[in-house]
């Protein structure tokens, strides 16, 4: 599996996160497995254990911009029960949150605030872009709206829709958990190389393209 190496920028030398240097590399643990089977397998097991703990205890940052935030909070109700995925602990401080959900329209005046809040989050951290406005500006193709939060933030998961349903938000959580389970991060802060290896995840459109083309009997709206 191919991995994307993104180096952390602790000194703030890069003005925008998407402009950081990225390389397409292989799994960094594979070479250790071949050099030393025992230590390589042990390190692989440690990474899997740490990733398991991270992906099953994701604390969201309580931050919303527009109507998509209403759909996000709906997933915390008893009907949908997002607590099943370990993401019900809403944090009011970015320093205690694991991932940020940019839900709604991001205006140019709000963009510096969003980026500052993201900078205050501790590593490891992730970003979910929720809704058409956060993904690409939506129907607001005007000077005052940022045409996609990925212009200044590294987005991990995109949720389409205007607004998306709570089920879409929960699916995004599952996709984020799948991505976190394949990450390769330093197991300790006492390390030299602060490289972060993230698996290049295939989009849901491409992954389910063949399955959707093969469908011959379409369901009626009442059956969906």
Curated annotation (Swiss-Prot):
Which enzyme class?
translocase
Q: Which PROSITE patterns match?
A: COMPLEX1_20K
Keyword Metal-binding assigned to the entry: answer is: yes
The source's domain of life comes to Bacteria
What is catalyzed by this enzyme?
a quinone + NADH + 5 H(+)(in) = a quinol + NAD(+) + 4 H(+)(out)
Mind listing the UniProt keywords for this protein, alphabetically?
4Fe-4S, Cell inner membrane, Cell membrane, Iron, Iron-sulfur, Membrane, Metal-binding, NAD, Quinone, Translocase, Transport, Ubiquinone
The residues that the entry says bind [4Fe-4S] cluster are 67-68, 133, 162
Topological type in the membrane: Peripheral membrane protein
Question: Matching InterPro entries, A to Z?
Answer: NADH_UbQ_OxRdtase-like_20kDa, NADH_UQ_OxRdtase_20Kd_su
- The record's EC number reads 7.1.1.-
Q: Which cofactor does it need?
A: [4Fe-4S] cluster
Q: Kindly list the places in or outside the cell where this protein is found, as annotated in its UniProt entry.
A: Cell inner membrane
Principal subcellular localisation of the protein: membrane
Entry note: cofactor: Binds 1 [4Fe-4S] cluster.
GO:BP terms for this protein? aerobic respiration; electron transport coupled proton transport
Is Chaperone set as a keyword in this record?
A: no
Q: One cellular component GO annotation, for this chain's record? A: plasma membrane
Annotated GO MF terms: 4 iron, 4 sulfur cluster binding; iron ion binding; NADH dehydrogenase (ubiquinone) activity; NADH:ubiquinone reductase (non-electrogenic) activity; quinone binding
Its job = NDH-1 shuttles electrons from NADH, via FMN and iron-sulfur (Fe-S) centers, to quinones in the respiratory chain. The immediate electron acceptor for the enzyme in this species is believed to be ubiquinone. Couples the redox reaction to proton translocation (for every two electrons transferred, four hydrogen ions are translocated across the cytoplasmic membrane), and thus conserves the redox energy in a proton gradient.
Which NCBIfam families does this UniProt record tie to the protein?
A: nuoB_fam (TIGR01957), PRK06411.1 (NF005012)
Family membership, please give it: Belongs to the complex I 20 kDa subunit family.
Subunit-level organization? NDH-1 is composed of 13 different subunits. Subunits NuoB, CD, E, F, and G constitute the peripheral sector of the complex.
Write the protein's name: NADH-quinone oxidoreductase subunit B
Q: Which organism was this protein described from?
A: Erwinia tasmaniensis (strain DSM 17950 / CFBP 7177 / CIP 109463 / NCPPB 4357 / Et1/99)
| This protein's encoding gene | nuoB
